[in-house]
From Swiss-Prot:
[8Fe-7S] cluster binds at C70, C95, C153. This is Nitrogenase molybdenum-iron protein beta chain. The gene is nifK. It holds the Pfam family DUF3364. One of its GO terms (biological process) is nitrogen fixation. GO terms for molecular function: ATP binding; iron-sulfur cluster binding; metal ion binding; nitrogenase activity. It comes from Herbaspirillum seropedicae. Its cofactor is [8Fe-7S] cluster. Tetramer of two alpha and two beta chains. Forms complex with the iron protein (nitrogenase component 2). GO terms for cellular component: molybdenum-iron nitrogenase complex.
């Protein structure tokens, strides 16, 4: 029901009106990927049982990786997978400190990421000045080829518009007008780290394929026989992606790994610090549009990205991680079908040894 001067509802009652209930329900269905309410209730009841109590108190590990983190953490993961790219989180320093420490603890490698250092004044008046100064400082200090921007709760609650802010920052001379600054809105109070990974990856592809926020013409797809591969939000990426690359090479498949953080989180101890290492190049991202198909691991890590790629005319094959013989067989057979290449004897030999 619309507000008017004669009948102004308090927020507690306003948000109970039918139009708001419908809006919240649609948001939950389309953006939060929520499970059914009866399932939520079942789990809630289970947490009150003796079984859950015993399971909860039986933990022995001092440190447990969270099963669910917030969107910007996933966005940082996605940004790290591109060559010479600096993740830039529009929000407070404390949030970014958490993302860096989380990844560094897990991979035992330093993780580079910066923030726009929003504080109380930015929370009230908006973070445009923080974006202007932050982009300029990031480019000057760390010399990335690309800065991938995401957001935290603070920026999203006040409604900061990344597209507008980045264009204003370029107008102010923070970075050159032609400099690549892909972005994605990643509100931490919706979804999880896999949602943020999905949003950020789609944001980077959209930036290059759809005309860099309207500043250049959109790319026209010219199909070829290449195969793209997206591994999803993978905590074992430093071992899994090199194996995927080996399989592509053994089969003679001409392919592109879209988002490859396997090197930056697996640098050698040789006395040299590498802020950037490996990753998908900008040219590879551009050429990925023309690929015949894209193979995706972890369906729920890339719901929006997979849909976007399919809308561009590519075949998208979504698989679970190929754990075990059956899963690996499915991956290899799909790769063979898409590429027209036979499965090599070396891989058949490895399979035989495993079965034996």
């Amino acid at each position: 029901m619309p507000q008017n001067a004669d009948s102004v509802l308090d927020h507690e009652n306003l948000f109970r009106q039918p139009e708001y209930r419908e809006l919240f329900a649609r948001k939950k269905e389309e953006f939060e990927f929520a499970v059914p309410l009866d399932k939520v209730q079942d789990v809630a009841e289970w947490t009150k049982t003796k079984e859950y109590q015993q399971k909860n108190f039986a933990r022995e590990a001092l440190t447990i990786n969270p099963a669910k983190a917030c969107q910007p953490l996933g966005a940082v993961y996605a940004a790290v997978g591109f060559q010479n790219t600096l993740p830039f989180v529009h929000g407070s320093q404390g949030c970014v400190a958490y993302y860096r420490s989380h990844f560094s603890r897990h991979f035992k490698e330093p993780t580079s990421c910066v923030s726009s250092s929003m504080t109380e004044d930015a929370a009230v008046f908006g973070g445009l000045n923080n974006m202007i100064d932050g982009l300029a400082n990031a480019l000057s200090l760390y010399k990335p080829e690309m800065i991938a921007v995401s957001t935290t709760c603070m920026a999203e609650v006040i409604g900061d518009d990344l597209d507008s802010f980045i264009k204003n920052a370029k107008d102010k001379g923070s970075v050159p007008a032609e400099y690549d600054v892909p972005f994605a809105h990643t509100p931490a109070f919706v979804g999880s780290h896999v949602t943020g990974y999905d949003n950020a990856l789609k944001g980077i592809l959209t930036h290059f394929w759809d005309g860099k926020a309207g500043t250049v013409p959109a790319l026209e797809r010219k199909p070829n026989e290449r195969i793209n591969f997206i591994g999803g939000f993978d905590g074992f990426v430093v071992g899994n992606l090199p194996e995927v690359k080996r399989i592509f090479k053994l089969m003679g498949v001409d392919g592109t790994i879209v988002c490859d953080p396997s090197e930056v989180w697996n640098t050698p101890t040789d006395g040299q610090f590498r802020m950037y290492s490996g990753g998908t190049t900008k040219q590879e991202v551009i050429e990925a549009l023309d690929a015949k198909a894209t193979v995706v691991f972890q369906e729920f890590s890339t719901l929006k990205t997979a849909k976007y790629i399919a809308e561009k005319g590519q075949e998208v094959v979504t698989l679970n991680h190929p754990m075990g013989v059956a899963g690996t067989d499915q991956f290899l057979m799909e790769l063979s079908r898409l590429s027209g290449q036979p499965i090599p004897a070396e891989l058949e030999l490895e399979r035989g040894r495993l079965v034996d």
